[in-house]
Amino acid sequence: MSDEPKGAILQRDKLTYAIVPRTPCGLLTPDVLDAVSRVCRKYEVPIIKITSGQRLALVGMKKEAVEPMWEELRLDVGRAVELCVHYVQACPGTAVCRFGLQDSLGIGVAIEEEYVGHDFPAKVKFGISGCPFCCGESYLRDVGLVGTKKGWTLIVGGNSGGHPRIGDVLAEELSTDEAKGLIRKFMEFYRDNSGKRLRVSKFVEKTGIEAIRQAVLG
């Protein structure tokens, strides 16, 4: 049984750790910021980094600091290595952006709440954009949504890693409820038919977007 602290990632020096608090869609509150500031000062955290997934990485702590830091932060763990949904990134959408056409933050938070804690064959990342400017990088995420005047466009199979892939459009002009429902069907299809550690992009390539459409749209 591993004696590594829970919710921590060993760093390259093999001595220090990083933790990633869960911050749905990059949303923070003054209380969360106060807690992070207080804890990082107390435990002398040398690096505080905003990640590409709209999360905070607290980096460089000794092993013995990890558990008390989590206790004092009182935040959930943002999963970063497990086979599950890692994050949902979202642009501001209609909440504040003058270009927003759909409520990207609203649907993004709902998606994260639905899938947090659920296991999948590989890590999964969502990108939600409230307009076609696509600031949520929707075409480069495992599952993406892009808002238009006529509703949501659902994209699957994107990847921004070492072998980048533009995702395939699964459906267009979806209402918010339709988008969430179709994502649910796709995630179930992926979970039940993918091999372990096969990312969504590879799964879509292997299966074919037409076969996926027949399976989840029929």
Swiss-Prot record:
First-tier enzyme category under EC: oxidoreductase
Keywords: 4Fe-4S, Amino-acid biosynthesis, Cysteine biosynthesis, Heme, Iron, Iron-sulfur, Metal-binding, NADP, Oxidoreductase
InterPro entries in the cross-refs: NasD-like (IPR052034), NiRdtase/SiRdtase_haem-b_fer (IPR005117), Nit/Sulf_reduc_fer-like_dom_sf (IPR036136), NO2/SO3_Rdtase_4Fe4S_dom (IPR006067), NO2/SO3_Rdtase_4Fe4S_sf (IPR045854), NO2/SO3_Rdtase_FeS/sirohaem_BS (IPR006066), Sulphite_reductase_assimil (IPR017220)
Documented EC number(s): 1.8.-.-
Protein residues bound to siroheme: C135
Function description: This enzyme catalyzes the 6-electron reduction of sulfite to sulfide. This is one of several activities required for the biosynthesis of L-cysteine from sulfate.
The protein's name: Sulfite reductase, assimilatory-type
Species whose genome carries this gene: Nitratidesulfovibrio vulgaris (strain ATCC 29579 / DSM 644 / CCUG 34227 / NCIMB 8303 / VKM B-1760 / Hildenborough) (Desulfovibrio vulgaris)
